[in-house]
Amino acid sequence: PDLVAHSEAVSRLSMALAQKLDLAPMRVEDAVLAGLLHDVGMRELDYDRAYRNRTPTEDEKARYQKHPVLGEEILKGTGLDEVASAIRHHHERWDGTGYPDRLAGDAIPFLSRLVHVAEVFDVLSVPGRYRPTVSAERALEIINRGKGHQFDPQMVEALVMVVT
């Protein structure tokens, strides 16, 4: 299914970014897990199957925006607190316009910022990921335009080094 393939791809790219950023081995493992599990809350919504072939309503979009919190709740009590936090905040934006908590800049957990850029690159550049696909080069252009607004500039620079 698309959600599984997407999660695997985000996990692999998160690992590559973590390694490029010279994170300690345990932090690389956390990045891999955060990438793999970032959309685990979607299972509670059945979003992948329900809305694939149509535009969701505003109510459905609001439900969708709860998946990071649902994902964090699924991981509570597992000892993966940093991964759970990364999952909760992977839709936060550098400028504070994201969700669920409208965090900005360095207030967004580091792994959330890493997973966010990996996820957007995958959604933009891989066929069958919920929207029309663009080339990897075009995806990088789009992400570069969001540097300092949607994305942490450090993560964008690491992404460019990893995928080019």
Residue ranges and their predicted role:
Residues P1-T164:
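Histidine- and acidic-residue-rich, metal-dependent catalytic cores
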